[in-house]
Swiss-Prot record:
GO molecular-function terms, A-Z: glutamate dehydrogenase (NADP+) activity
Catalytic activity reported: L-glutamate + NADP(+) + H2O = 2-oxoglutarate + NH4(+) + NADPH + H(+)
Free-text function comment from the UniProt entry: Catalyzes the reversible oxidative deamination of glutamate to alpha-ketoglutarate and ammonia.
Swiss-Prot/TrEMBL GO biological process terms: glutamate biosynthetic process
UniProt: substrate binding residues: 92, 113, 116, 167, 380
This protein's UniProt keywords: NADP, Oxidoreductase
Keyword Oxidoreductase attached: yes
UniProt-annotated catalytic positions: 128 (proton donor)
Family: Belongs to the Glu/Leu/Phe/Val dehydrogenases family.
Protein name as catalogued: NADP-specific glutamate dehydrogenase
Organism of derivation: Salmonella typhimurium (strain LT2 / SGSC1412 / ATCC 700720)
Site (Important for catalysis): 168
Binding site for NADP(+): 211, 242
Amino acid sequence: MDQTCSLESFLNHVQKRDPHQTEFAQAVREVMTTLWPFLEQNPRYRHMSLLERLVEPERVIQFRVVWLDDKNQVQVNRAWRVQFNSAIGPYKGGMRFHPSVNLSILKFLGFEQTFKNALTTLPMGGGKGGSDFDPKGKSEGEVMRFCQALMTELYRHLGPDTDVPAGDIGVGGREVGFMAGMMRKLSNNSSCVFTGKGLSFGGSLIRPEATGYGLVYFTEAMLKRHGLGFEGMRVAVSGSGNVAQYAIEKAMAFGARVVTASDSSGTVVDESGFTPEKLARLCEIKASRDGRVADYAREFGLTYLEGQQPWSVPVDIALPCATQNELDVDAARVLIANGVKAVAEGANMPTTIEATDLFLEAGVLFAPGKAANAGGVATSGLEMAQNAARLSWKAEKVDARLHHIMLDIHHACVEYGGDNKHTNYVQGANIAGFVKVADAMLAQGVI
């Protein structure tokens, strides 16, 4: 494309290339809209078709996964691995198992992952993978057979210096273990390229907690910069999985009163706030095969909002930790009307573009996921470092490194985020991540 093309021309070009990939187009629009003024002031980043290369994955692998269920019936699923950008290191990003998974979602996640990984300052490129397989309601044997069948194709595309997957929605420590074990068997190599592994075979302490902890570390830094803090604040958390659970734990440790959790069926509201004991029980319920927050609400006699999200509950801080596009413009209006002071994304792109714009216009502090939830991949990078050195660090060391990385990410966002009075963290995160990747791509030539 012409280096003098407009933002809309560029976005139309992306849309025409993949007209049905709405999630990917949304992610590109969100990033490029904030980048464009910076690009106009720094035209060297328009050379050598850098932007066109940046929005095109280096490689997309699509394949079928054939496996046997418990009834000995043949099942067929689709799987993908999007190896988006390796300019600053091996592809790094999770594997997602969910019926909604498609190429558009994985491209959006891989695109976001590229900038997120760059923000950590660790040498990791961006990638993402997954399948439309649904682990819910499956037996452990079925999950194992699916994971092993998937790896018979995927293993040939992975390696510690090539592509290092991890977990995501539907992929926890159990699934990572099954995939890493099959990878070891097929490759005849014990390097176990996955991160998020069990502690018994190369995993890192604090890795399960890292995304939730990192979210709270980043949010606390953002609040402190603007004269606020978690202490005494009412907090709404969406989701009840790994990220939500550890975000609740760390927010409580910082003195917040967390009043909600949710799942796809509804929201539990606890006006007195979570306690460590209540959170432990929620984690137990969610770890069971069919555990729902409705069960938790009944057990403790709490308010349950069936089919609703948490955003109607008046709070000071909102932490969306469930899934993409869960917080739309209508929910944003309600939060703003109820006096929300800060929103920080624990999930990947949980806030729609329109809702994000509304928060920024209203002066609400807003932390985008590529910065706020980078703690998970940052600690995966630390796991890779421990594996390479054949060492295992104590939890305190990993947590301290994670906290330091999140503060560094916050500093980078502030550096590129505009005026000192009210930092635009969306702009700051996008520009900071872009500059790191773009400089590496330009230095390596047209490849």
